[in-house]
Amino acid sequence: MDRIRIVGGAQLNGTIPISGAKNAALPLMIAGLLTDETLILDNVPRLADVAQLQRILGNHGVDIMAAGKRPGDHEYQGQTLHISAKNIIDTTAPYELVSKMRASFWVIAPLLARMHEAKVSLPGGCAIGTRPVDLLIMALEKLGATLTIDGGYVIASAPGGLKGAAIEFPKVTVSGTHVALMAATLARGTTVIGNAACEPEIVDVADCLNKMGGKISGAGTPRITIEGVAKLHGARHTVLPDRIETGTYAMAVAMTGGDVQLSGARPELLQSALDVLTQAGATITVNNDGIRVTRNGAGLNPVTVTTAPFPGFPTDLQAQLMALMACAKGASHITETIFENRFMHVQELARFGARIQLDGETATIDGVAKLRGAPVMATDLRASVSLVIAGLAAEGETMVNRIYHLDRGFERLEEKLSACGATIERISG
């Protein structure tokens, strides 16, 4: 099993190109099931989760062709996928495929909308709390589908097609919003999604669906209106840059010190996180090529942060911020409100010498002068990269094990960091 070896202490200086957003690329690929024409997606990141979803879609009969780089593309330019779901041969998504990635459960929406039936295994993926699919099922039932759970599968049918409806989520749900959005696009009549998630990735998917002939308004607000259409056509769409990758590398620079240009980043996608970094002592400069992050020799300031749905501080940057605050001058407080059981990285950060106390959903981090390298084990995607950030600043050698979590969400992380001066390498075997 691959590991990552880091020798800490080097500042980061240079340019890091930001990849396409995983959290947009996955639902965009799934949206390809909604049409029998070809959907072309540019700037798709090369990630394990993307490859896994290609296998899942292939199981349904979807033909996916990955095109090479075009003239003028950057070395790290994401891949272009041509997705053709002209002939859907199977409406069942089996356990052995879905169990490896939770987002793959979302195929239930386009299969139900277009084929009027679906049988999808209950999902897998990162072990963060329970993440129930109840809200997704509720949304599809509102649209007129009949759903039952049998033998670990959700069996859905809508023989007469889906019908527009009012869907009011009791709490903000990104997954539920994606599923409702895709399903309602081909439903008869008007659908209104209340308390919808406002994340940029939702907006990106809605933009793509509109290019395909959908009639969606209000994406990015808590109220989305969808006028159902009979058919969607092919389109070409570029995946937006990854705000979580942007924030992760910005925090790495704040941790080590240095000067790094995050090429292609869009600051409006993560303003709350950039504000926190500024408060912590980093300097953020917006320019035509993205975001420049610098930190001189001054120490890090402690911060108090509560995770929240967009535009609040992202839960997917919580672990990285905790690693950063492990070296702040004073006590920081981080409260997690989105997912339960999302502090599994605490015990691993403690192996570096971090001082962290948990009280319910709040972590108190008492900064230390220096972290020490250690062998550590990744527990989930975002926790794994927090260990990399800690290792970049720690004295001595750090070995991060179980890095398959990293490969699910970060494209060529060790290469991007190494190009900026970090001593980091992947060890195979």
Curated annotation (Swiss-Prot):
Phosphoenolpyruvate binds at residues 22-23. GO terms for molecular function: UDP-N-acetylglucosamine 1-carboxyvinyltransferase activity. Gene3D superfamilies: Enolpyruvate transferase domain (3.65.10.10). Keywords: Cell cycle, Cell division, Cell shape, Cell wall biogenesis/degradation, Cytoplasm, Peptidoglycan synthesis, Pyruvate, Transferase. Pathway: Cell wall biogenesis; peptidoglycan biosynthesis. GO terms for biological process: cell division; cell wall organization; peptidoglycan biosynthetic process; regulation of cell shape; UDP-N-acetylgalactosamine biosynthetic process. It catalyses: phosphoenolpyruvate + UDP-N-acetyl-alpha-D-glucosamine = UDP-N-acetyl-3-O-(1-carboxyvinyl)-alpha-D-glucosamine + phosphate. InterPro entries: Enolpyruvate_Tfrase_dom (IPR001986), Enolpyruvate_Tfrase_sf (IPR036968), MurA_subfamily (IPR050068), RNA3'P_cycl/enolpyr_Trfase_a/b (IPR013792), UDP_GlcNAc_COvinyl_MurA (IPR005750). GO terms for cellular component: cytoplasm. It is found in: Cytoplasm. Pfam families: EPSP_synthase. The active site is at residue 126. UDP-N-acetyl-alpha-D-glucosamine binds at residues 102, 131-135, 316, 338. Its EC number is 2.5.1.7. It is an enzyme of class 2 (transferase). The modification 2-(S-cysteinyl)pyruvic acid O-phosphothioketal is found at residue 126. Cell wall formation. Adds enolpyruvyl to UDP-N-acetylglucosamine. NCBIfam families: murA (TIGR01072), PRK09369.1 (NF006873). Belongs to the EPSP synthase family. MurA subfamily. This is UDP-N-acetylglucosamine 1-carboxyvinyltransferase. The lineage of its organism: Bacteria, Pseudomonadati, Pseudomonadota, Alphaproteobacteria, Hyphomicrobiales.
